[in-house]
Amino acid sequence: MKASQFFISTLKEAPAEAALASHKLMIRAGLIKANASGLYTWMPMGLRVLRKVENVVREEMARAGSVELLMPVVQPAELWQESGRWEFYGKELLRLKDRHDRDFCMGPTCEEVIADIVRKEINSYKQLPKNFYHIQTKFRDEVRPRFGVMRAREFVMKDAYSFHADYASLQTTYQDMYDAYCRIFTRLGLAFRPVAADTGSIGGTGSHEFQVLAESGEDVIAYSDTSDYAANIELAPTLPLKGERAAAQAELVKVHTPNVKTIDSLVDFLSIPIEKTLKSIVVEGENEGELILLLLRGDHEFNDIKAEKLAGVKSPLTMASPAAIVEQFGANGGSLGPVGFAGKVYADFATEKGADWVIGANEDDYHYTGFNFGRDAAEPEFVDLRNVVEGDESPDGQGRLKLARGIEVGHVFQLRDKYTQAMNVSFLDNNGKSQIMEMGCYGIGITRVVAAAIEQNNDEKGIIWTKAMAPFEVVIVPMNYKKSDTVREAADKIYAELLAAGADVLLDDRDERAGVLLNDSELLGIPHRIVIGDRALKEGNVEYAERRDNEAQAVAIGEIVARVTASLNA
């Protein structure tokens, strides 16, 4: 492709609102253009990258036995009402009416649509298992779109759905798709980790995320320094502490702590280690008017996903109102504790072996020092309430945990019968008896993969594309292409020979200054660059550099095609 026939639109500066490297570089490199908040046009250069990702995904989906179809973006409300997600999904689901006043939505996922298709088309165990996928535009009305295509309202996603006669069959396909995802992200050249994950609003049982490792990632993953264990921090369990509880050394003393409402201010006021404090979180129970007290160490981070799964806790997790707290505890938040509280109390595992805690006294502006479980209040039920921290024992018993940030680019779920039961997706088994199908779903955020790859592969000059994702494999940068016959002839010859060798080549024949052409080639991140100029040609050479190391070297003009093709095929 010649640049004069293509479209290249680069910027020297990124817009002020762009925070992430990927957002800045995608705008500067002209991969995307913003149309509105969270809405982008994929420009020709960006679309080539998107298509490269899609091609890898399609090849691996076919290898895994998934069949491609294409479902609609606009979906009828009755399917979502049937599954129960019409109301549950909330405002992220963009709802609309047609001219006949019928309700529809812009699909953020397609579980309902594919379930409806399958229940109409498959009725026998002989037709199972089946695995379908499509690559389609999705829409989620994000309350605050940000970070470019990383969290846009409109995005491209590959979602696959499998249907099975039994759970064993689902597990087999789940593993096949898990393996396919590993191959996809490996082929794309990304550093990633599959991690055990929460199922979230999709539902079901087993679930894994595929996280591209990047310091800018919104997610935190925990992994063992010894084994293959890895999980999203939301799911990684903490283990009960071993050994005996420390002996109580202090008496229970009520201390006046005026205007002390936070753990940090308590630590400063009493000049104590934060590890000796307990913080109180009050949530609603399943029964009307019931409150449940949750206790964890002051330096630990509360995990609401774990808390929501506790017996007796209302789902979804609901924090108690200030009025309800005052009514049952006699104090406001910031001064709460278990002493005198008659309701259910859960305490985190990390508090079980400790003694002489500092905790709220259930009286405004007062705390207790020297608090001990069993002596000053009934023994709570010790459970897992917190996020893991670095150095915690790995849940598999092998090694210690480390933490890293990641960007979720893929997610696989064992949905089981969450949707098939609600929508009566059934089949006749080999005994002629009607059974509900087992279901799995498997998603990859195609547009997010592009942004995540840039987060992982960039420098101060621009993008550094991996081999599989680059919009072009090679860029030829001729100096004075329009004015120098020698340069033009050499550039055209190398261009033709590389095309004949099967390379994906961009010949930048734009009438621009040398500095613009060179800067654009680095900004665009094309892996291999050949610079052709009159001075080097007089010595029989061209300049060759790989974008990842940017070390330019003189290569004989008669050897450059072989040199580049060898690198491409390595």
UniProtKB/Swiss-Prot annotation:
Name recorded for this polypeptide: Proline--tRNA ligase
Tell me where in or outside the cell this protein is found.
Cytoplasm
* InterPro entries hit by this protein: aa-tRNA-synt_IIb, aa-tRNA-synth_II, aa-tRNA-synth_II/BPL/LPL, Anticodon-bd, Anticodon-bd_dom_sf, Pro-tRNA-ligase_IIa, Pro-tRNA-synth_IIa_bac-type, Pro-tRNA-Synthase_IIa_type1
Q: Which GO terms describe its cellular component?
A: cytosol
What is the similarity comment for this entry? Belongs to the class-II aminoacyl-tRNA synthetase family. ProS type 1 subfamily.
Q: How does it assemble?
A: Homodimer.
Job description of the protein: Catalyzes the attachment of proline to tRNA(Pro) in a two-step reaction: proline is first activated by ATP to form Pro-AMP and then transferred to the acceptor end of tRNA(Pro). As ProRS can inadvertently accommodate and process non-cognate amino acids such as alanine and cysteine, to avoid such errors it has two additional distinct editing activities against alanine. One activity is designated as 'pretransfer' editing and involves the tRNA(Pro)-independent hydrolysis of activated Ala-AMP.
HAMAP family linked: Pro_tRNA_synth_type1
Q: Which GO terms describe its biological process?
A: prolyl-tRNA aminoacylation
E.C. code:
6.1.1.15
A Gene Ontology molecular-function term? Answer: aminoacyl-tRNA deacylase activity
Catalytic reactions of this protein: tRNA(Pro) + L-proline + ATP = L-prolyl-tRNA(Pro) + AMP + diphosphate
Q: Does the keyword Manganese apply?
A: no
Q: Does the keyword Cytoplasm apply?
A: yes
Q: What is known of its domains?
A: Consists of three domains: the N-terminal catalytic domain, the editing domain and the C-terminal anticodon-binding domain.
User: What are the boundaries of the signal sequence?
Assistant: none
Q: Which UniProt keywords apply?
A: Aminoacyl-tRNA synthetase, ATP-binding, Cytoplasm, Ligase, Nucleotide-binding, Protein biosynthesis
Which EC main class describes this enzyme?
ligase
| Principal subcellular localisation of the protein | cytoplasm
| Matches recorded under PROSITE patterns | AA_TRNA_LIGASE_II (PS50862)
Q: Which organism is it from?
A: Neisseria meningitidis serogroup B (strain ATCC BAA-335 / MC58)
